[in-house]
Design a protein with these regions (language model features):
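A structural signal for short, well-ordered beta-strand elements
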Residues: 9, 46, 111-114, 148
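Hydrophobic, well-ordered secondary-structure elements that form the walls
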Residues: 30, 66, 91, 101, ...
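Phosphate- and divalent-cation-binding pockets in alpha/beta enzyme and binding domains
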Residues: 52, 100-103, 148
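C-terminal helical cap/extension that packs against the catalytic core
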Residues: 78-135, 171
Length: 173
């Protein structure tokens, strides 16, 4: 659409193409972190609210192994759980709100796993996704990181570090 408008204005396409090729999202905003063992790993740690998580779930190809949780900061957790349920193959939940999310999802989803610690949830998500062909692990928590981290950036870095360590282990002889 942008190229059509650019052409309509009779402007050269080269600068538009150059700008498009140089564009990238900031870290932890629906970024493809790794792909191995038939699984793609997406880091959307910035998604600290329901709307952002729902947008990510709409953007990532199914089947989705979702990593959700953290610290609730208001909003209707039960209604949010019902909205995400239809997008998920598996829910891997963690943190202060993990148990509450699991209860809200139990009538809508068969595969729900709850962990206290974030890194355990990431490892479990990778293991569970490996059993589902062409799956996507999506960290798009929907809640703040402050139960275990200083910021969403720190949570995103932890996700990346854990995923890359798992990738190294898969490639090790």
């Amino acid at each position: 659409m942008a190229a059509e408008f650019w052409s309509f204005l009779d402007l050269p396409l080269a600068p538009l193409i150059e700008a498009a090729n140089a564009f990238s999202l900031a870290p932890h905003r629906l970024a493809l972190t790794a792909e191995f063992a038939g699984v793609r790993f997406w880091d959307d740690s910035k998604a600290t609210n329901f709307h952002a998580t729902l947008a990510a779930l709409e953007s990532v190809e199914r089947p989705i192994v979702w990593i959700g949780g953290g610290r609730a900061k208001g909003g209707n957790v039960e209604a949010f759980a019902q909205e995400v349920a239809g997008h998920l193959a598996v829910a891997v939940l963690y943190g202060e709100v993990g148990g509450r999310l699991a209860q809200a999802l139990e009538d809508s989803l068969d595969s729900i796993h709850v962990y206290t610690y974030f890194e355990d949830a990431v490892r479990a998500a990778a293991r569970l996704a490996a059993a589902i062909p062409h799956s996507n692990v999506l960290l798009s928590p929907g809640f703040s990181s402050f139960d275990q981290f200083k910021s969403y950036e720190e949570r995103g870095k932890s996700f990346t570090d854990t995923v890359l360590s798992l990738k190294s282990a898969v490639k090790a002889p």
